[in-house]
Amino acid sequence: MSRISRQAYADMFGPTVGDRVRLADTALWVEVEKDFTVYGEEVKFGGGKVIRDGMGQGQMLAAEAMDLVLTNALIIDHWGIVKADIGIKHGRIAVIGKAGNPDVQPGVNVPVGPGTEVIAAEGKIVTAGGVDSHIHFICPQQVDEALNSGVTTFIGGGTGPATGTNATTCTPGPWYLARMLQAADSLPINIGLLGKGNASRPEALREQIAAGAVGLKLHEDWGSTPAAIDCCLGVAEEMDIQVAIHTDTLNESGCIEDTLAAIGDRTIHTFHTEGAGGGHAPDIIRAAGQANVLPSSTNPTLPYTINTVDEHLDMLMVCHHLDPSIAEDVAFAESRIRRETIAAEDILHDMGAFAMTSSDSQAMGRVGEVVLRTWQVAHQMKLRRGPLAPDTYYSDNFRVKRYIAKYTINPALTHGIGHEVGSVEVGKLADLVLWSPAFFAVKPALVLKGGMIVTAPMGDINGSIPTPQPVHYRPMFGALGAARHATRMTFLPQAAMDRGLAEELNLRSLIGVVNGCRRVRKPDMVHNTLQPLIEVDAQTYQVRADGELLVCEPASELPLAQRYFLF
């Protein structure tokens, strides 16, 4: 039997079982757990390579073969870190296994035929497209920025750069919901809209859900009173949608105890649960320990650095329509920015108490940095806290699975769309992101949306090859014309489907129906299930989890930063 060195094999076909890969310039390493390919029967495209007629490519018709195969990919997902070929059919993940020609090769379950396209994923990492569950729809150009960062699904609300949208993630009322659903139909990203949940009577909330809202947002700027919270959650229980909440920073209508009492044992998604983005001062972070609370962070506080506090004050004044000449407005802003709770947030993420990360796009958050900042936290926590059991200093597989779940499967489960997106699993939309390991979490090699390339780095269009400088991200064919509608999904609640809303609005995109929102609990948050007793000292703001004081120094230097953004 012919043999080649492990290094030569990795150079040709990508890493295999036991090989380790560093994630960009972080301190994180992953080790390949399983290889679905067959040694000696690997498929690869190119001159003199395997995927040729009668060799790695068979004679089957399109109905029997894949539309697209990603060869020799290193998949990093919440369920594993494995090497495999990925078969895509009709825009969905069809098979994860061994590609090739079953007529002449053993073990093939990803058949390649004359109708099959190939993306070479040797030496590349493949992850699921990110799910950003805290979007202010302030401008449509956010979509380009998000796609170029590896995010393929938006959950949020808004109507453009209106004052209400600049502060709150709400698309209020049936008329605006209809217009935003029609606008979203032309954007090459999956979208679900949140309606305004601040009401003390249920009728106006029910009509928003029937008009297409997949969830309701309670925001203190509209009045997150106990009455509004109770009413909103009552409608959510009735109509199986999620509720997201930004609680009362000023504690005017009640404190954290009153909000938790109003919520009861009902599931709720708490936004920026640390509090700098808003919420009961100084102890909204306590909510992260509740079994029915699904806590997320927004990315400006992630990770805690020497610049975090200074940046937040200016952001807050703009986003919440505050006046720096009014003492009460300044006091409101300062009450939300606490070094101690921001530092504790990173540690609670590493412990698995905080389950999700998100952006808060253009409203105290950066839409293109959800993926990047999540991994910066993971890096910092490895440096500060060492390996997470059962990891060793040689690999960080468990920590990597915990952190990737925060912006993929967990927000998808939270908002009832986990059956369509959020992981690299058979049957789900082929929303996939390819990364060169050196650029992981920073700059994707290309992004697939529903099986088509939607964005990618591209060189000089008049060049004789695709790679001459200047290279920058450009929209691809998946972002154009009717291809958008065949590869993107609009999410709707069952109540909107029952009334035929998609047909009424002439929506041309794929439709996904949210379900199971009310059954999701903290134990369902993949790799992020911890429910500690969290205590905050009202005078010093020190945070303890199950009695442990949570403190860490701010970072003065980070990976995934200036090294990658000279241009």
UniProtKB/Swiss-Prot annotation:
CDD domains: Urease_alpha
Gene Ontology CC terms: cytoplasm
Top-level enzyme category: hydrolase
Gene3D superfamilies: Metal-dependent hydrolases, Urease, subunit C, domain 1
InterPro entries: Amidohydro-rel, Metal-dep_hydrolase_composite, Metal_Hydrolase, Urease_alpha_N_dom, Urease_alpha_subunit, Urease_AS, Urease_asu, Urease_asu_c
Subunit structure: Heterotrimer of UreA (gamma), UreB (beta) and UreC (alpha) subunits. Three heterotrimers associate to form the active enzyme.
NCBIfam families: PRK13206.1 (NF009685), PRK13207.1 (NF009686), urease_alph (TIGR01792)
UniProt protein name: Urease subunit alpha
Origin species: Pseudomonas putida (strain GB-1)
